[in-house]
Amino acid sequence: MYWNILGEFDLMNSFFIGNVEIEKTAALAPMASVADKSYRLMCKEYGASYLVSEMISSKGLCFGDKKTARLCEIEKEERPYALQLFGEDPYYMGKAAYKLNEYSPDIIDINMGCPVPKIVGNGSGSALMRLPDTAAEICREVVKNADCPVTVKFRAGWDENSINAVEFAKLMEQAGASAVTCHGRTRTQFYSGKADWDIIRQVKEAVKIPVIGNGDVVDGESAKAMYEQTGCDLVMIGRGSYGRPWVFRDVKHYLETGEKLPEVSIEEKMAVMKKHCELICKYKGERQGMKEARKNCAWYVKGLKGSARLRAQCGGLNTISDLYEMIDHILANELGE
C-alpha cells in the first residue's frame, strides 16, 4: 500500500494483466523513434515498472522486413515487456501476432492511438477509432493468435465531437483484450492542450479489465493525481521522460513517501546522458548511434547554462569522443571549474 493509515493515499502495490504482474508505479509509453532498446533500459534502471516497444508494422513483420524484426528483440532486463503492433488489416495483424510469439513477449499491445498522418492515412493507429468494427476484428484476431495477454492503446476519440473512448474500451474488452490504455487527448489534439483525465476515469468505471492512464504525467505529484482522479491501474509516461529517465524513480519515491526527491545533480545528469549514448552506440554502432543520440542529448541539456547553444552543439555530435568532450565542457561550466 502507498501512504496508508489515514495518510489518505491508498494504493495496492501491483496488479495483473492476464497472468503478468506489474508494479503499480509508472510505465514507459511506446514512442516511435524514441523508446528504443537503450531508452527503455535507461528507464527500467530508474524504476519503470512496465515497458512497451516502439510500434511494429504488422505487414513489415509478415513480409520479413529485417528492420521490423529487430524492433521485436527483447532483453531479459526489460521484462515485464510488451511488443506493440500496428496495422489496419485483421488478417495481417493476426498473422503478425503469431510471429511475435517466437520473441516471447509478456504482452502484445495493439496501437489504435497513434495520431501521425502517415499511420492514420493507412487506416492504422487512431484511424481505427472511427472504424470500431474493424478495430474489434483486429483485436479478436490478435487475441486468437497470441500466446500472451493482449492490450489495446487508444485515445479519447478522433476529435472533440466524437469522444468514444468508453464505447471503444467496452468493445475491446468484449473482443478479448486483457487491458486497455487510454490517452486522454483526441487524435486532432495530437499532443497539444491538456489530456482529459475524466475520460480515463469514465473508461475505468465502464470496464472490468485493467486500465492504464496516459497523458500529462510528468512527476510524482501528477502521477498520484492521475491515480486519485481516474482510479486507473497504472499511469504511463511518454514525453515526460525525455532526457529524464529518473522520472520513474521520482514517481515511485513520491508514491511511497509523499516526498519529492532533490533535483538531479549536473554530475548525475551527465553520467546518465553518457551511459545512454554509450548504450545507443552499443546496439546501433557509433556512426548511426550518435546520429540518433543527438535528440536525446538535446533533451538532457535542456535547462542548463547556455542550453540553446548546447542544443545546437548536440546536432553536430558525430563520435562518442565528441560527446565526452561536450560533457567535460558542460561540467566545467556548470561547476565553475
Predicted regions and their residues:
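Alpha/beta enzyme core
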Residues: 95-108, 112-124, 133-209
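Glycine-rich, positively charged N-terminal anion/phosphate-binding segment
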Residues: 11-16, 31-106
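Hydrophobic faces of well-ordered beta-strands that scaffold small-molecule active sites
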Residues: 26-30, 51-53, 81-85, 108, ...
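Alpha/beta catalytic cores of nucleotide-metabolism and tRNA/nucleoside-modifying enzymes
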Residues: 6-15, 22, 26, 32, ...
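N-terminal small/glycine-rich loop or linker at the start of catalytic domains
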Residues: 15-26, 59-80, 114, 118-122, ...
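Active-site beta-loop-alpha junctions enriched in small/polar residues
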Residues: 31, 56-58, 86-88, 113-115, ...
